Amino acid sequence: SVDFDSESPRKPEIQ
């Protein structure tokens, strides 16, 4: 999982 996907704007999974 990633904080935030730059290419696909979506809700962050784990911060």
From Swiss-Prot:
A molecular function (GO) term: calcium channel regulator activity
Compartments, record wording: Secreted
Tissues where this protein is expressed: Expressed by the venom gland.
Protein name: Cysteine-rich venom protein Bco13
Domain of life assignment: Eukaryota
Cellular component terms per the entry's GO annotation: extracellular region
Lineage: Eukaryota, Metazoa, Chordata, Craniata, Vertebrata
Species in which this protein is naturally found: Bothrops cotiara
Similarity comment: Belongs to the CRISP family.
Described purpose of this protein according to its UniProt entry: Weakly blocks contraction of smooth muscle elicited by high potassium-induced depolarization, but does not block caffeine-stimulated contraction. May target voltage-gated calcium channels on smooth muscle.
PTM summary: Contains 8 disulfide bonds.
Record has Secreted as a keyword: yes
Keywords recorded for this protein, A-Z: Calcium channel impairing toxin, Disulfide bond, Ion channel impairing toxin, Neurotoxin, Secreted, Toxin
